[in-house]
């Protein structure tokens, strides 16, 4: 009798499957609609140059060795080769299954039923130390199945990083914790340097773009509380363009963010990850991104990173230092 061969099962986008923890999840977050929207032709300025360097291989090796999920992979980020080739990565905590289903995001959706990797804080700290990072971005899926939304897990991870790598700056791109100030405070007391929570889109488009449990005002309130509670911590948010918003709505969102004391803003082009996700309404030109950056700076943002391929954590270390060279062209 011949030897049995393990054949990997390929899960199609929009289909249900079981994770290694036994969680039922939907691949890429959105159920298959059976429809294929007509896509706008991609403009030449959105061409992505792949970088392959020893640093890229080193980051990939460390991520796999310590069983870390990265938003670079899970969210199909267009900048993965560039960032990894520069020895940086955005680490995604608390697994790769999100309890929410935002219609722009390709992270898998399901209910982890309270599962957490207890070794993740120390594994993450070890990886950051081995990479010798000056700056690290931590993000996560939403974990509405946890009483604190994962705030204590974030805090443990940040403290572990600071203990092993005290000079490393830590940015936390977090869920909204359902607006709980208590949970946000737990994270802010961990020694984090930058607190980020993404508003994602303009107020009018919040409901069709984000999960119903998210809210425009809820995000603004979380960011305002963070600044009030810890004035020394920089606050940050991100806005995707090309979902049907107007330039006037973008500027109004800037005003709302400044009213709520947000320090840093990133602006980037929305890219449709699969045919089941929201279609692209328009491609915003590099010139418009550059103009919006100047408008934002005049409104008093500490920094505005603005460009077609900019994502919330893209070159975050340079944005933190106000070294935004090349991000607005």
UniProtKB/Swiss-Prot annotation:
Database matches in PROSITE patterns: RADICAL_SAM
Domain Radical SAM core, chain residue ranges per copy: 83-303
UniProt-listed SUPFAM superfamilies: Radical SAM enzymes
Gene Ontology CC entries for this record: cytoplasm
Record has S-adenosyl-L-methionine as a keyword: yes
Coiled-coil ranges (or none): none
Keywords per UniProt: 4Fe-4S, Cytoplasm, Iron, Iron-sulfur, Metal-binding, S-adenosyl-L-methionine, Transferase
Cofactor(s) the protein requires to work: [4Fe-4S] cluster
Reaction(s) this enzyme catalyzes, per UniProt: [[Fe-S] cluster scaffold protein carrying a second [4Fe-4S](2+) cluster] + N(6)-octanoyl-L-lysyl-[protein] + 2 oxidized [2Fe-2S]-[ferredoxin] + 2 S-adenosyl-L-methionine + 4 H(+) = [[Fe-S] cluster scaffold protein] + N(6)-[(R)-dihydrolipoyl]-L-lysyl-[protein] + 4 Fe(3+) + 2 hydrogen sulfide + 2 5'-deoxyadenosine + 2 L-methionine + 2 reduced [2Fe-2S]-[ferredoxin]
Location(s), subcellular: Cytoplasm
Listed EC numbers: 2.8.1.8
Residues noted as binding [4Fe-4S] cluster 1 in the record, renumbered to the chain: 72, 77, 83, 313
Record-listed [4Fe-4S] cluster 2 binding positions: 98, 102, 105
Pathway, per record: Protein modification; protein lipoylation via endogenous pathway; protein N(6)-(lipoyl)lysine from octanoyl-[acyl-carrier-protein]: step 2/2
Cofactor binding notes: Binds 2 [4Fe-4S] clusters per subunit. One cluster is coordinated with 3 cysteines and an exchangeable S-adenosyl-L-methionine.
UniProt KW Metal-binding keyword: yes
CDD domains recorded: Radical_SAM (cd01335)
InterPro entries linked: Aldolase_TIM, Elp3/MiaA/NifB-like_rSAM, Lipoyl_synth, rSAM
GO function term, MF aspect, one: 4 iron, 4 sulfur cluster binding
Enzyme class: transferase
Family: Belongs to the radical SAM superfamily. Lipoyl synthase family.
Protein name: Lipoyl synthase
Organism: Legionella pneumophila subsp. pneumophila (strain Philadelphia 1 / ATCC 33152 / DSM 7513)
């Amino acid at each position: 009798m011949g030897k049995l061969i393990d054949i990997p099962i390929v899960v199609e986008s929009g289909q249900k499957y079981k994770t290694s923890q036994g969680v039922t999840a939907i691949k890429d977050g959105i159920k298959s609609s059976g429809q294929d929207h007509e896509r706008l032709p991609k403009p030449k300025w959105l061409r992505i140059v792949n970088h392959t360097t020893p640093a890229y291989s080193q980051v990939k090796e460390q991520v796999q060795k310590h069983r870390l999920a990265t938003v670079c992979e899970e969210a199909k980020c267009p900048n993965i080769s560039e960032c990894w080739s520069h020895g940086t990565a955005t680490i995604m905590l608390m697994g790769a299954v999100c309890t929410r289903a935002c219609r722009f995001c390709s992270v898998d959706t399901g209910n982890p039923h309270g599962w957490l990797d207890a070794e993740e804080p120390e594994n993450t700290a070890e990886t950051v130390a081995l990479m010798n990072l000056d700056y690290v971005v931590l993000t996560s899926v939403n974990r509405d199945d946890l009483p604190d939304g994962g705030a204590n897990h974030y805090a443990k991870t940040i403290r572990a990083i600071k203990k092993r790598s005290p000079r490393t700056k830590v940015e936390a791109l977090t869920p909204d914790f359902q607006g709980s100030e208590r949970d946000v405070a737990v994270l802010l007391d961990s020694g984090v340097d930058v607190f980020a929570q993404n508003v994602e889109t303009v107020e009018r488009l919040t409901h069709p773009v984000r999960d119903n449990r998210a809210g425009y005002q809820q995000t603004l309130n979380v960011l305002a509380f963070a600044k009030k509670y810890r004035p020394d911590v920089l606050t940050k948010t991100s806005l995707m363009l090309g979902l049907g918003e107007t330039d006037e709505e973008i500027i109004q969102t800037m005003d709302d963010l400044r009213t709520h004391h947000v320090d840093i803003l990133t602006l980037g082009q929305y890219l449709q990850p699969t045919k089941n996700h929201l279609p692209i309404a328009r491609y915003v030109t590099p010139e418009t991104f550059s103009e919006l950056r100047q408008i934002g700076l005049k409104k008093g943002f500490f920094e505005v990173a603005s460009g077609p391929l900019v994502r919330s954590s893209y070159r975050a270390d340079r944005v933190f230092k106000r070294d935004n060279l090349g991000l607005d062209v």
